[in-house]
Design a protein with these regions (language model features):
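N-terminal secretory signal peptides that target proteins for export/translocation
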Residues: 1-11
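C-terminal motif of bacterial Sec signal peptides marking the signal peptidase cleavage site
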Residues: 30-31
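N-terminal hydrophobic targeting/anchoring segments and the immediately downstream early-domain regions
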Residues: 34-139, 343, 385
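Second-shell residues forming the walls of enzyme active-site clefts
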Residues: 50, 69-73, 86, 98-118, ...
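Short glycine-enriched loops at secondary-structure junctions
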Residues: 64-66, 127-135, 139-140, 178-190, ...
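A substrate-binding/cap region within the structured catalytic cores of diverse enzymes
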Residues: 147-178, 182-214, 218-222
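Mid-to-C-terminal alpha-helical segments outside catalytic/metal-binding sites
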Residues: 361, 366-393
């Protein structure tokens, strides 16, 4: 009698537990479906757009000046052409750029407000705010101080990384940014690397440590609806040269472990976008640098690592590209390689008509068959899906 009673009680408890588990799983599935549905419901009917407007979404433009008017070329590019976004810089005398976008907090807030007001479809307001040396919102301009990735990696305290990232993100939110071109997940393989290690941009040479700290940085941004971007794929940390100033070949220094932070973070499902490097590696592609390489972007990043989000080029105006390829070739190769969003910093050789000129250029490539309409739809679709998740009210 006692055994039968225990058995009935045991079966009843098991039934209750299984029912609770079933309800929990159904709730989770419903939540996922609701999230997916919510993202989809926010999307405008972009498929009905003209090919010109879809191409415009693929442009992330730089421009000179700390203020804009409705007649400014960037205002026209946003309002009339529908470009996907802008990227803001401070002055960079090292690169000969002395008229950019950031001088003080009040000026910046006004500029970003005016940029957003020009847009019918929400635009990316992007910045390279990595912390430490690579900071556009510098303390001397009146913004809060930040620390570098290398400092955080040396401390190796995830709580410190989280709190530091939270403070940085609060600044981005305060001024209206919605896309931070960070974190850097390059491995600090070459301590004399002029563009990574010497600029204190890497957490570590250890892929696991880089992955862990980058995950904290990403989480800080996501808590405040800021889009992030891993860079520089497939790895710039072993280089001896700087792609801002010339050709960079990592064939003899690059290693497979440089892919591990991407693999780890993509596997966690937290990666919004990935920026390509202008590095050349004959082991990955005997003909083209990563930004222009279908083998690297479509073959490794998408097929091998399983990433189906937005791929962003590093600036196509950098010397590693412009010294070796015409503008037309760079744009065509980048899009066909799998780049969805083209950064055109438009700095040392400023072109006020960069938006309509690039749109017309790509339209002609579509009409001639050099770039397929399907590829444009694929890129625009990824961009709009990302915007719906973070930018749409």
């Amino acid at each position: 009698m006692h055994c039968n009673s225990f058995s009935r009680q045991h079966r009843f408890s098991l039934h209750v537990a299984m029912t609770a588990l079933t309800l929990l799983l159904l709730g989770l599935l419903a939540g996922c479906a609701a999230t997916s549905s919510a993202v989809t419901s926010k999307l405008p009917d972009w498929r009905s757009w003209t090919v010109e407007r879809k191409i415009a979404q693929m442009l992330l433009l730089g421009f000179p000046g700390e203020t804009i008017t409705p007649e400014s070329p960037i205002s026209v590019a946003i309002r009339e052409h529908g470009v996907g976004g802008v990227v803001l810089f401070d002055n960079n005398a090292d690169l000969g750029v002395t008229e950019r976008n950031i001088s003080n907090p009040a000026q910046l807030k006004r500029l970003i407000t005016d940029l957003k007001a020009s847009a019918e479809t929400p635009i990316f307001i992007a910045v390279d705010e990595e912390g430490g040396i690579i900071s556009r919102l510098k303390e001397r301009y009146g913004f809060p101080s930040t620390v570098s990735a290398s400092y955080l990696g040396e401390k190796n305290d995830l709580n410190l990384t989280r709190s530091s990232s939270d403070r940085l993100v609060d600044t981005l939110v305060e001024y209206g940014f919605n896309l931070n071109l960070a974190p850097v997940v390059d491995l600090s393989i070459n301590p004399a690397n002029p563009v990574i290690a010497l600029k204190q941009r890497s957490f570590s040479a250890d892929p696991a440590l880089v992955s862990a700290h980058a995950a904290e940085v990403i989480a800080s941004h996501h808590r405040k609806n800021i889009v992030t971007c891993l860079k520089h794929f497939p790895g710039h940390g072993s280089s001896r040269d700087d792609s801002h100033v010339g050709f960079v070949d990592v064939t003899d220094s690059w290693s497979e472990k440089e892919l591990l932070p991407y693999k780890n973070l993509i596997g966690q499902g937290v990666v919004d976008s990935v920026m390509t490097a202008h590095t050349f590696n004959t082991h990955l592609d005997p003909d083209y640098p990563a930004t222009l390489s279908r083998n690297t972007i479509d073959g490794i990043l998408r097929t091998r690592l399983g990433f189906d989000g937005v791929v962003i080029s590093d600036d196509l105006y950098m010397a590693a590209i412009v010294q070796h390829y015409s503008y037309e070739t760079a744009v065509e190769k980048a899009i066909n390689a799998g780049v969805d969003l083209l950064i055109l910093a438009n700095d040392k050789l400023y072109s006020p008509d960069i938006a309509p000129r690039t749109i017309d250029l790509v339209v002609k490539m579509v009409e001639s068959g050099k770039i397929s309409r399907e590829r444009i739809d694929q890129a625009c679709g990824r961009i709009m899906k990302l915007k719906a998740r973070y930018l749409f009210e």
